[in-house]
């Protein structure tokens, strides 16, 4: 097992040494083969087409990808912040529901049970709106 590890390392190092020589030989063979004037023109045509395509694309898009990515991040953060403001509204709504419960029970203590069930129902509605708002805020940021 150890002998195969040593052999594999030596083989890899000799291949690493031999690679540049093989590349140089391949380059000289390809340059010798494509020495005719027709071949050089043929090689230049795709590069001209690619250059004109790049220029057309650059003329169409006047911003860099870094700026576009930064603007997407800023809009996500603004959307999340705007949606998170609604969570404050949910907190205020819960406070109003239980404040009204205290006021109603102080005026008519006999209806305490019925008023408390209505208050729990109002709390559930306000909490559902708050959770929906939190879900929208997370979707603005991460989707």
From Swiss-Prot:
Q: Site (Reversibly protonated during proton transport): give the residues.
A: 127
Locations listed in the record? Mitochondrion membrane
Keyword Chaperone appears in the UniProt entry? no
Membrane disposition = Multi-pass membrane protein
Any one GO MF annotation of this record: lipid binding
User: What's one GO BP annotation on this UniProt entry?
Assistant: cellular response to salt stress
| Organelle transit peptide residues | 1-62
Keywords, comma-separated and alphabetical? CF(0), Hydrogen ion transport, Ion transport, Lipid-binding, Membrane, Mitochondrion, Transit peptide, Transmembrane, Transmembrane helix, Transport
As for family, the record states:
Belongs to the ATPase C chain family.
Q: What assembly does the database describe for this protein?
A: F-type ATPases have 2 components, CF(1) - the catalytic core - and CF(0) - the membrane proton channel. CF(1) has five subunits: alpha(3), beta(3), gamma(1), delta(1), epsilon(1). CF(0) has three main subunits: a, b and c.
Tell me the function of this protein. Mitochondrial membrane ATP synthase (F(1)F(0) ATP synthase or Complex V) produces ATP from ADP in the presence of a proton gradient across the membrane which is generated by electron transport complexes of the respiratory chain. F-type ATPases consist of two structural domains, F(1) - containing the extramembraneous catalytic core and F(0) - containing the membrane proton channel, linked together by a central stalk and a peripheral stalk. During catalysis, ATP synthesis in the catalytic domain of F(1) is coupled via a rotary mechanism of the central stalk subunits to proton translocation.
Entry protein name: ATP synthase subunit 9, mitochondrial
Origin species, per record, is Emericella nidulans (strain FGSC A4 / ATCC 38163 / CBS 112.46 / NRRL 194 / M139) (Aspergillus nidulans)
């Amino acid at each position: 097992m150890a002998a195969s590890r040593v052999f594999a390392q030596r083989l890899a190092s000799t291949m690493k040494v031999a690679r540049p020589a093989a590349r140089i030989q391949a380059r000289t063979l390809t340059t010798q083969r494509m020495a005719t004037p027709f071949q050089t023109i043929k090689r230049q045509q795709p590069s001209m087409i690619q250059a004109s395509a790049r220029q057309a694309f650059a003329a169409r898009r006047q911003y860099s990808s870094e700026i576009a990515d930064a603007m997407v991040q800023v809009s996500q953060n603004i959307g999340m912040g705007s949606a998170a403001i609604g969570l404050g509204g949910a907190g205020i709504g819960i406070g109003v529901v239980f404040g009204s419960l205290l006021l109603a029970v102080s005026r008519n203590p006999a209806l305490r049970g019925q008023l408390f069930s209505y208050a729990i129902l109002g709390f559930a509605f306000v909490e559902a709106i708050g959770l929906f708002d939190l879900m929208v805020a997370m979707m603005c940021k991460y989707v």
